[in-house]
């Protein structure tokens, strides 16, 4: 829209403000990024109110120190808008100036920059107010509102002030408090999980304050209780007299636990024979030997035993006798008396016919014939 023209300013004119690029009569007060032009108030209102596209141009005011460059930072201590060169020059003069808090200046869009000057000052003050956030004028439109919020989300730091409007200098206070709350919640969570684990393992909780009674459960068997006692041995040092409860509600006052003698609360009197218990190292659990593993270790032979067995087997094989053994003598005797036909066992009918034939022969001949089987 506008074309920036070069301004040849001599060394003697460096102290004067830069003139407007349009009228060249008034000092410039606004810099338009879209047109790359320095404009005065009247020219800015005339140019950027022509149409809606021109009203969306982003403009910033000119540096209040040199009045020859667009302002980039707002110094809260000096309440001045400075360009990059003037900001580095002013705030590097002494250590006190380095502590001034500066915030970037956002471009402003609208029909007239002069009508938005008050809004711009209010928005800059709101940026540094801890109880408010960045205020975006509704006249900027949806696009300007979105851009301003996006830039403010990563450009503007969070500044904290106390009631006397003084900077407390602790920018990490909120993060530190959040960290403390997180640690306390994690400690509470760990304590809750630990107490629940103790309840599940039948280990009574201790309050570490004075004498207390320790309820014990006797529903489990002796072996299971001993196993649980070996698995859960915590390094808890305490000294007090324990009072034991059984299932019937009776109290057993005979058990006394000392902080120098034991480091774990016993679960029942069935596994506790004396008041002192040897403390086992952490992470060690005594397991009962497996019978199957014992049998496997017994059946495993050494090479010498195996060689001796092989030799005995070979000697026994040399003297082996291949004889026919009779397993059932009664069956053998019955088989011998059964009739046979051509070497095979005959049926009862054939046997009866042969017996009748033999009887007839004996009657005819007058003497008996001994049959041969």
From Swiss-Prot:
Expression sites by tissue: Expressed in leaves, shoots and shoot apical meristem. Detected in the vascular tissue of the hypocotyl, the cotyledons and the leaves. Restricted to the protoxylem and phloem in young inflorescence stems and to the phloem only in older inflorescences. Also detected in the vascular tissue of the root.
Composition skew (Polar residues), residue ranges: 109-120
Binding site for Zn(2+) 2: 63, 66, 86, 91
Induction profile: Expressed with a circadian rhythm showing a broad peak between 12 hours and dawn. Higher expression under long days.
Family per similarity comment: Belongs to the CONSTANS family.
Further comment found in the protein's record: The GIGANTEA-CONSTANS-FLOWER LOCUS T (GI-CO-FT) pathway to control photoperiodic flowering under LD is conserved between Arabidopsis and rice, but the regulation of the downstream gene by the upstream regulatory gene is reversed in the two species. In Arabidopsis, GI acts as an activator of CO, which in turn activates the floral activator FT under LD conditions. In rice, GI activates HD1/CO in a similar manner to that in Arabidopsis. However, under LD conditions, HD1 suppresses HD3A/FT expression, causing the suppression of flowering.
Subunit structure: Interacts with ADO3, SPA1, SPA2, SPA3 and SPA4. Interacts with MRG1 and MRG2 (via MRG domain). Interacts (via B-box) with MIP1A. Interacts with AS1 to form a functional complex regulating FT expression. Interacts with NFYC9. Component of a red light-dependent nuclear complex made of PHL, PHYB and CO. Interacts directly with PHL in the presence of PHYB.
Entry protein name: Zinc finger protein CONSTANS
Source organism of the structure: Arabidopsis thaliana (Mouse-ear cress)
GN (gene name): CO
